Amino acid sequence: MRRPVAVLSAFVVALVLVAISMTNVGAARSPLSTPAVMAFPAGDDWEPAVDSDGAGNVYYLATHFGGVPSCASCADPTITVQVSHDGGRTFDAPRPLTVGPSTQYDPQVKINAAGIVFVSYLLAKDTVVQRSDDLGASWSDPVAVNADVKQGPTDKDGLAVLGDDVYVGFDVAQKFFVSASHDGGRTFTTTQINQNTLGWPLNGGATVAPDGTVYMVWELIHKSGQAQGPQDVLVTKSTDRGASWSLSYADTGLPPGPACPTSCGWDFLGTGAAIATDQAGNVYVTYNAPLYDHGPPHAWYRSSTDGGASWSSRIDLSTDGTPSFHVFPGVAAGPAGDVRVAWMDNRTGAYNVWYRSSADGGSTWSADIQVSAFRSGYAYVTRQGFAFPYGDYITLALDPSGTVQLAWGEGPDYNGPGNTLYSHG
């Protein structure tokens, strides 16, 4: 979701200029497809989500600003959906999930083993879920997951699905919650995670292990007024289908991130986290954070083989060795030890999306692989990359066939207009 615009620092502009002076580090050839511009090629699209059932059906969501063509009743912004039935080679035209006056943000999409598609997003003050039982041809009406905790506007939803069990995390100011459904998203019961103030929470993602254990990752920002203080990466865990939750810190006391080189939302380049579990139940977390206050962020990786009771030493995912900004990391996992990661950085003087894989749970990794690519017709894209990340996150998924699904946003700056892109392989 777009956050209020923040005041910028000249110090960060200097850091960006340092990054621009660095040369590119050689990268391996990408195993993923040439990136495709999704939603509306003219923009303005932001914060995409993607998932695939592994049987050729791919679902791509984006937040569209500026009004949906031929939909006078659509909100601004509106969540749009595109569906592919040929494994992501072609997609139908974007269409709104919900037609109405209420603004929509932060789409998430997950698919269960039966091929039922679930989406969550912010609809006005609520966090809602819809489902499709016919490969995206039609969608149920939105169901507010927070109906039993009407305490204020919700933010930053995270979605996880296993069978008929649907879990949605969200926050209301300094409180954070998980709503659980055990009837396929038709009704929800909500549990408040924190009874005491732990910081300003933002959900980074959610996952369900094969044994039904649910994990969510949260970024906790400690602040006074608009000043950003230390930030934590918190993992919450439920072994009783969302009725109760335990807490495990993957990292704590992280320095606040840098300001932006142009106007941005609050804490836009601060800690952002993602989470995944493999088929053996191992847990993987990625997050970005600098080594010192307002310094250039690194993309970090940690894993747990004991359900979050302990965490491995953190690994710096990028091998470029430059003082560039590494932000918006994502993580996905499949069979035991099969881990995929992606992030954005500006090692070339512009931003690109980078990808790595590991077959042994992160003990060893492939080379850095550049996924994003030059395309003509967009002033903010050069041979070095794109000008700035567009949206608060990227989405990385690994479908049951072992195919990577990757979605991200690119733009001239935080305010856009920008575009969302898709690659798979």
Predicted regions and their residues:
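Bacterial N-terminal signal peptides
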Residues: 9-20
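Extracellular, repeat-based ectodomains that mediate carbohydrate processing or recognition
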Residues: 26-425
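N-terminal export and membrane-targeting signals
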Residues: 1-11
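Intrinsically disordered, low-complexity boundary segments flanking structured domains
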Residues: 20-26
